[in-house]
Amino acid sequence: MRRRFLLAAALALLPAAAAGQARDCELVRANNARRIQTPTSEVWFISGPADFVCSDGTEVRADSAVLHKGVSLELIGRVFYADSARTLEAERAVYYMASARLHAQENVVLTDRQNHGSVIRSQSLTHERAQPDRPEARTIASGRPRPHATLYPRSSTDAAPGDTAAQPFEVDADWMEIRGESRFNATGNVAIARGETRSGSQRASFDEADERLVLSDDAWVEQEDLRLQARTIEAVLSGEQLRLVTAVDEAHLEGRELMVDAATIRLEFQDGALQRLIAVVPPPPAPSAGGETALERPRAVALARDLRLVADSIDALAPGQTLREIIAAGDAFAQRQADSLSAGLPELIANDWVSGDTINAYFVLAEEATDSVAAAVDPAAPPRPDSAAGAAPDSAEVVLERLIVTGPGGRAQALYRASRDGNDPGPPAINYTIADRITLVLSGGEVKEAEATGDVRGRYLEPQGRSARPTSETESTRTQRPPTTGSR
């Protein structure tokens, strides 16, 4: 009974299924057990293999063990611990009784039996049991090679076999910590993978109760053809799928159809697919004589295909993960990239551009744009076999179809070029318009239709050698000169 009592006091290694419940443990196999007692200590040397079994089902095995009564229990060689909640394997382990702390070394493997088999592998692992003065248990993994964790969210245990929702988080880091039953922290070149999603940072934390993952310091996330990076990225899950991702401080996104830079970028998902992007910057300071200009203050910038937009906020709508609309608000400016019509033109008129309070850019699948043109030519013609109806959303290309710029009080402006008719290789005509609202319809990369409402003014300029079209503008070209692209 003496030996059984002493071992029972020592074998509280990890939090068992019934924490705090009394455990009676017995040495069931050992080659030799020798006791050395002094006036100040009592030590048991157990040569093995040493096997212990406890009344609650806990099992402990090691090649040998050293018990310092009331101080520590050291397990040496092929250490194995198992209770109903988890198992631990290591080459060496020491349990310190007063602090209720376990330290395991060399080839440590900690497996959670109750959570779909979550596993932590490391060269060094320290576990501190919950105590009256320490309400939460704490596990720390470190060492070289770096720790690796395979973590299954608890809700994934209800997923069907083979369901992608049951995919674990694969985590590598220099240092890992688990607090309680739901909080995970990692530092030092953190790399996280789950299915096709990859992410990384210098620091990471995951709160399973709140379903929230926070990546800090050089954070990045990749998913299929999408990459997001910032100082800090926070992801909110809904069950096992992404619901909301927010990137803060020097946020940058690169996608197949869109590239965005802003102080903050927020991505909204539905059923795991990106539906909406919102990019914002801090509000501009109050106007002053020496205040910042639109060029100097932080702006949100988006590049969608060949269209560059600059504004205080940018809202991109992508239902089904296909770009359909971008709304640029707040001193907005949009410019199309250089094309064949730009050759030989001054910078001021080399590219089509619009500016105003708000710009709405609408996109369609390239096949839809082609079919709409074909339908206009021959309404009775059947749709092409490879039209948008049969194209995969993730492989179809989108093109700019329409621009609407608004700015009451004549703050809407547009400058666009019109190519010559026929085979005339000369420079294009230039159309500059000021109004309250301007709509441009594009086809084949060129403006085909334009509509302006409100107090409409402007200029239509043709190169020398072309017949000038009469205009109704009352102001001179000098007074109606458009702003330079550098001011936006």
Regions found by a protein language model. Give the residues of each.
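Intrinsically disordered, low-complexity segments enriched in polar/charged small residues
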Residues: L7-A9, P483
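N-terminal amphipathic/hydrophobic interface segments
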Residues: G20-R488
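Hydrophobic h-region of N-terminal signal peptides that target proteins for export
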Residues: A9-G20
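Bacterial N-terminal signal peptides that target proteins for export
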Residues: M1-L7
